[in-house]
Amino acid sequence: MKKSNRTFSRALLIMMVLLNAGIFSCSNPKDKNKATLSSNSVNIQISYPTAQGDQPLDGRLIFLISKQIDKEPRFQLRDDSKTCQGFGMDVLDWKPNKPLQFDSKAFGYPIRSFDSLPSGEFFVQAVFHKYETFTRADGHVVKLPMDRGEGQKWNKAPGNLYSTPKKITISNGQFPNLTLKLDKKTPPIPQPKDTKYVKHIKIKSKLLSDFWGRDMYLGAHVLLPKGWETHPNVKYPLAIMHGHFPSDFGGFRTTPPDSSLKPEYSERFKVEGYNLTVQQEAHDFYKTWTGPNFPRVIAIKIQHPTPYYDDSYAVNSAAQGPYGDAITYELIPYIEKQFRGIGEGWSRFVY
């Protein structure tokens, strides 16, 4: 056991050294100048105008620093060695035109403090992730970010405030004084449109609304079998896809792959032209789904994000509430009634 602990500790130490050696993707690996910043040398003032709302806000304020500008810094913070730099603070009762300040004591990722940042040219941006106050049925009052149709992605959540990226220079360890205005707001996410085969539904859950003390919703993307509309008296089994938050019923494409599409490399799967493969597989699935020998069933992908995460894992829990019951006794019966499911336990399959 002691040997195992030593091995783990050594591996962890090596990993931390490697991560910090990279200085995140927004720095230049050749720049080793990390002059120490004095305790009073960081002064970053961030505020939002009254035009963004006149009520005090609760949430998380995130300050981002990136070397790259091919996309905004808010889309470059990630959980690997290619991340940009971020600093964050929890915020309560923040009023418009009242600046909040990041100073040298702010906690950062992946580099702990402003003191250790390298010199060079960077792009900075601030984002405010809004929280709501939930008065729950179990007596707890919590402040959390409500999902707004994005699948719990703080950098895409509608209604969040953010600033225009700004170029700065850190010279000889001196971080410039900054004043940033959160003058932009993330727009609503367009809802997917119904097609012949794919439908989209959303219901209010009484069970979840009672638990969370506000209106709570469940949704689903519904894939209908071939012949569904021409056989109005037929009832179908239900195949339930349980996974993370789906924005649509992906992997199903009625048209052939786009012949003008240029191959793209997938960093996740280490495959060149993965985007072409995705389109081809989606079209192949459509042909199989509508083929003469494929079983006629209804398939669904459910949307059940919580204030904590992009999905509830479809179970009841003390922390998240009765999601298992809400899906089983509210969402599934509603779908089966709307789209002529058989509605029996033996006719349902989770995959």
Where are these regions (language model features)?
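Bacterial lipoprotein signal-peptidase II cleavage site
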Residues: 27-33
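Bacterial N-terminal signal peptides that target proteins for export
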Residues: 2-13
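Hydrophobic helical h-region of N-terminal Sec-dependent signal peptides
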Residues: 13-20
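Contiguous beta-strand segments within globular domains
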Residues: 37-48, 54-61, 215-221, 240
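Non-catalytic cap/lid and distal C-terminal segments of serine-dependent acyl enzymes
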Residues: 51, 67-107, 112-351
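C-terminal motif of bacterial Sec signal peptides marking the signal peptidase cleavage site
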Residues: 22-25
